[in-house]
């Protein structure tokens, strides 16, 4: 649950707020209810009273042109609708009746010198990230050739060793062991590392390694977009993998399908090279190049020509 006070504190660097009224309602919650960030804050709108209401110059001019009785009526509609906070943009001064109403009903009233349109944009970006669906996944998250790659698999398969090999080849570490993912946009999942584990990689026999100190600043990343999941599995006689799968394998992550590659762990296999190859192939597919599809077309043409 996000409160008005948290919103003010988290945006103190970009949006300087000044409390005008409703100081006792700092813990007032901003309702989420699964709504998009665009629906949680916007210009004054009586049809959507339950969002953070922003008064710009036009909205304040609209409000002040009415008599006191009409203003009270509009404020009652907002209050009944459960308005979480009222923000005055552009450094505007609040009318005394608005201050009195907010104090009486304990609704936070704040002002800021930031322009109304910019204020709404900043808060929508903030709310979109703050209230995004999140999950924590066990694995290692890396930047491989500019692509966010999550390495998963059961314990003891060498995920951290593989990550260390990739880092030594010039790729970057985002998070190890516990990776926090959030769906920050309808078609985008971002992954980052918890503050406690930043820059750290745990390798059996070596313990904790500070990757940033060992390999330098360019060896770590703050966050990446998830594009590929590489799942490591033990190589057993019972496993039967399709050598040429006709359909891409995907895994659901926060409601989005993410491309997935299965790699068998066996003696003599260079997994780092295989991961790089999988990433390069994924990049080609994102560009619309389907190697298997082109091969099947070539094969079909060869069969057609040989049958003539």
Curated annotation (Swiss-Prot):
The active site is at residues 138, 159, 177, 243. Both phosphorylation and phosphorolysis are carried out by the same active site and suggest a common mechanism for both reactions. Belongs to the HPrK/P family. SUPFAM superfamilies: HprK N-terminal domain-like (SSF75138), PEP carboxykinase-like (SSF53795). This is HPr kinase/phosphorylase. It is an enzyme of class 2 (transferase). It catalyses: [HPr protein]-L-serine + ATP = [HPr protein]-O-phospho-L-serine + ADP + H(+); [HPr protein]-O-phospho-L-serine + phosphate + H(+) = [HPr protein]-L-serine + diphosphate. Gene3D superfamilies: HprK N-terminal domain-like, P-loop containing nucleotide triphosphate hydrolases. Residues 201-210 are annotated as: Important for the catalytic mechanism of both phosphorylation and dephosphorylation. One of its GO terms (molecular function) is ATP binding. One of its GO terms (biological process) is regulation of carbohydrate metabolic process. Catalyzes the ATP- as well as the pyrophosphate-dependent phosphorylation of a specific serine residue in HPr, a phosphocarrier protein of the phosphoenolpyruvate-dependent sugar phosphotransferase system (PTS). HprK/P also catalyzes the pyrophosphate-producing, inorganic phosphate-dependent dephosphorylation (phosphorolysis) of seryl-phosphorylated HPr (P-Ser-HPr). Its cofactor is Mg(2+). Mg(2+) binds at residues 160, 202. It holds the Pfam family Hpr_kinase_N. Homohexamer. It comes from the Bacteria. Its EC number is 2.7.11.-, 2.7.4.-. Residues 264-269 are annotated as: Important for the catalytic mechanism of dephosphorylation. The lineage of its organism: Bacteria, Pseudomonadati, Pseudomonadota, Betaproteobacteria, Burkholderiales. The Walker A ATP-binding motif also binds Pi and PPi. Keywords: ATP-binding, Kinase, Magnesium, Metal-binding, Multifunctional enzyme, Nucleotide-binding, Serine/threonine-protein kinase, Transferase.
